[in-house]
A protein has these predicted regions:
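Non-catalytic, usually N-terminal nucleic-acid engagement modules in DNA/RNA processing proteins
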Residues: 11-193, 305-311
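Single conserved hydrophobic/aromatic residue that forms the stacking wall/gate
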Residues: 1-13
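Cys/His-rich short segments
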Residues: 316-320
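Glycine-rich phosphate/ribose-binding loops and adjacent secondary-structure elements
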Residues: 170-173, 182, 186-188, 194-315
Length: 320
């Protein structure tokens, strides 16, 4: 059956529901996203390997994902703002989602120090000290002018102790409230490049179902534009990831888009869609393609192998 639910820009979500899989439309100021959808990762504003914004349109891409941390370091978010925001900077006119930078701070950066205010860390480029907290992340994303801004969160290492994961979830909730308040301030003062920028919150809790569920209940009350599941696909068994999604899904708002961060293998996407997820991203497709690894219905092939040099057959017989 079709259900239409409207709470304003970005929240119009038409869906057809069969079991937990959903078919929907997510409307934004930069266009409507047909879901389920995969976001192509353009970390610093371009897909590695030489793909242009025109190429993305040609292959039917709907959303481009750029990274707050990397763009802040180089070329600098203020420069991007001076050039009119990411859409003018990249010449991509569709929806753009910017990651908050939290994952990179906790995975790439060295010598980090976490406090209630935020995180102090050393740049992976030259080692200089940087501070980033909820307000700073929102300010950078306001300069970038993305369609969707992700809230600043703590992505704990896996495995992590239950007590630390619980404290981290509570801190991430407090940071989310600060993100929401800062975005409202930036819009009110006319500072944001995109006054219609949307905010997604991120569910954390490592691989502890009780923490995942409780955290989702907390952030679902904040009336955000969308909700993401973060901190998965970081080394835990695949079945554990699926179980965490299944545990959290009943507590995710039905009328809001759902995003599983960092997941992008065909099998993972199908399994997650069946569990009620709408949106995905991963560097794997473009990274694999650059190295000649191609997905087919029969599995992955390495097109650089000598046996394919004079092979005239279609790469995938099902697509021939």
């Amino acid at each position: 059956r079709d259900l239409r639910m409207s709470r304003g820009l970005g929240d119009v979500y038409k869906r057809q529901q069969e079991h937990n899989a959903r078919r929907g439309e997510f409307k934004t100021v930069h266009g409507t996203v047909q879901t389920p959808a995969f976001q192509n990762v353009a970390t610093a504003g371009a897909i590695k390997g030489g793909l242009s914004a025109h190429d993305l349109k040609d292959i039917g891409a709907q959303v481009m994902l750029c990274n707050t941390y990397h763009l802040h370091l180089r070329p600098g978010d203020k420069l991007v703002a001076d050039m009119g925001g990411l859409h003018k900077f990249t010449r991509w006119n569709g929806p753009i989602l910017t990651d908050s930078g939290g994952f990179q701070v906790f995975s790439l950066a060295k010598l980090r120090k976490i406090t209630e205010e935020g995180v102090t860390f050393a740049s992976h480029l030259d080692g200089h000290r940087i501070f980033m907290g909820p307000e700073e992340s929102m300010q950078i994303q306001a300069n970038l002018g993305s369609t969707i801004a992700m809230a600043f969160d703590e992505c704990v290492e896996n495995p992590a102790q239950h007590d630390y994961s619980k404290d981290s979830c509570e801190r991430t909730t407090r940071w989310l409230k600060r993100c929401k308040a800062e975005m409202a301030r930036l819009k009110h003062e006319g500072i944001s490049v995109n006054p219609d920028q949307l905010l997604f919150g991120i569910n954390q809790g490592c691989t502890y179902a009780d923490l995942r569920v409780e955290h989702m209940k907390q952030i679902a009350e904040l009336e955000l534009d969308g909700y993401a599941i973060g901190g998965l696909a970081v080394g835990e068994p695949t079945e554990v990831m699926y179980e965490m999604i299944s545990q959290v899904e009943p507590y995710m708002p039905k009328d809001k888009i759902r995003y599983l961060m960092g997941v992008g293998t065909p099998g993972n996407i199908i399994e997650a869609v069946a569990r009620g997820v709408d949106l995905f991203d991963c560097v794997m497709p473009s990274r694999n393609a650059r190295h000649g690894h191609l997905n087919t219905w029969g599995g992955i092939i390495n097109i650089k192998n000598a046996k394919y040099e004079r092979d005239e057959r279609p790469i995938d017989p099902a697509c021939g």
